[in-house]
Amino acid sequence: MSTDTGTTESKPRHGRPGSLENPEVAYENVPGHVIPILEREFDDFDTEAGKFLHGDLREDEFIGFRLKQGVYGQRQADRQMVRVKLPMGGINPEQVEAFADVIERYVPLKKGHITTRQNIQMHHVPLDDAAKLIRELGDTGLSSREGCGNTVRNVTGDPWAGVCDDELFDITPYAAAYVRYFVRHPTTQLMPRKIKTAFTASDADRAITGIHDIAFIPRVREIDGEQVRGVELRVGGGTSIMPRVAPTIRDFVTLDDGEYLKVSEAVFRIFDRQDWLRKNRARARIKVLVDKIGA
């Protein structure tokens, strides 16, 4: 009797997820592992950095690539600032140890900086060491991908999300899904300017949603007799030039069906198409667009 079911088993993949041998990226449900790590991005960085250091790649050709990997050039020759994202400010003990290790070995000043947007930055790193640093941090689930450039920057959150008694529900899983959805997203790779995002846990607004380009506040509504989780969506806040408090553009956007991701993507697509904003970097922010067309 034949046992052939008519299906073909896929061959097992070899190599780390994201490598050329294994291009598939599986989400790891591990605390602190939010952004999928792609091994081939480290290989590409090694290659492009090598070309630049050997004079085979112009600086203007290298800058865009470097920024997407979270590496900023400094005014000092061959010195970089590396910015590593901590989505929602989350970090686990293994990652703290990894930071201590790479800072001791690769950062001349032997220190890092915790930023107001829940990143960790390391300064004065030689370019060839920057490549090693981001690769080694990647082994612990840490990523610098799109920590710089005109992308969706690190997503910040309420430090008390998930444990505070004034929240309607834990917003953290939805924030993490947003991070994974927009990292490497084709629409968000070269927008007119960067996007700063916040997810807060409650109306206490400890994440300060009003100063962000896009921000989310938990809401619950009864729909057809069911308690449905959603968010109030605010767009167009900011400080610096033209300080603005982000207005609410949608009172309620559902979460569990992914509608909040679709609406966010629509906002970014509209923003990305505004080529007139690209002419003046200082004004190329979503708040300027909201001022012009309204919320």
Regions found by a protein language model. Give the residues of each.
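Peripheral terminal and linker regions in Fe-S/redox and tRNA-modifying enzymes
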Residues: 2-295
